Amino acid sequence: MPKLAVVLLVLLILPLSYFDAAGGQAAEGDRRGNGLARYLQRGGRDNEAECQINTPGSSWGKCCLTRMCGPMCCARSGCTCVYHWRRGHGCSCPG
């Protein structure tokens, strides 16, 4: 089988939701909420965890250990999410 055919076969098998171009971490959850969010709640570790499900009814989503801003995760704690006209959401971090 030629290499191109193998690559195309692999891309068809692996859903694109496994890959996150925004730099966040894709995490598996369930229909009641996100598994990573519940894990972080144990022991008071959920202070800054924010999660969102990619599509309604999906068990896949993205979780940030910092602030979630639009489709991205901010690089550090203490950042705020701002909206720039024509550029979309972005993180504004102190210092």
From Swiss-Prot:
Localization: Secreted
Residue numbers carrying 4-carboxyglutamate: 50
Keyword line: Acetylcholine receptor inhibiting toxin, Disulfide bond, Gamma-carboxyglutamic acid, Hydroxylation, Ion channel impairing toxin, Neurotoxin, Postsynaptic neurotoxin, Secreted, Signal, Toxin
Main location: secreted
Keyword Aminoacyl-tRNA synthetase: no
Cysteine disulfide partners in this protein: 64-73, 69-81, 74-91, 79-93
Residues modified to 4-hydroxyproline: 56
Signal peptide: 1-24
Tissue specificity statement from the Swiss-Prot or TrEMBL entry: Expressed by the venom duct.
Gene Ontology cellular component list: extracellular region; host cell postsynaptic membrane
GO molecular function, one term: ion channel regulator activity
Pro-piece positions: 25-45
Family stated for the protein in its record: Belongs to the conotoxin D superfamily.
Summary of the function given for this chain in its UniProt record: Alpha-conotoxins act on postsynaptic membranes, they bind to the nicotinic acetylcholine receptors (nAChR) and thus inhibit them. Through its two C-terminal domains, this homodimeric protein would bind to two nAChR allosteric sites, located outside the nAChR C-loop of the principal binding face and at the adjacent binding interface in a clockwise direction. This toxin specifically blocks mammalian neuronal nAChR of the alpha-7/CHRNA7, alpha-3-beta-2/CHRNA3-CHRNB2 and alpha-4-beta-2/CHRNA4-CHRNB2 subtypes.
Quaternary context: Hetero-, homo- or pseudo-homodimer (identical sequence, different post-translational modifications). Heterodimer of [carboxy'Glu-49', hydroxy'Pro-55']Ms20.3 and [carboxyGlu-50, hydroxyPro-56]Ms20.5 may exist.
Domains (record comment): The cysteine framework is XX (C-CC-C-CC-C-C-C-C).
The protein's name: Alpha-conotoxin-like Ms20.5
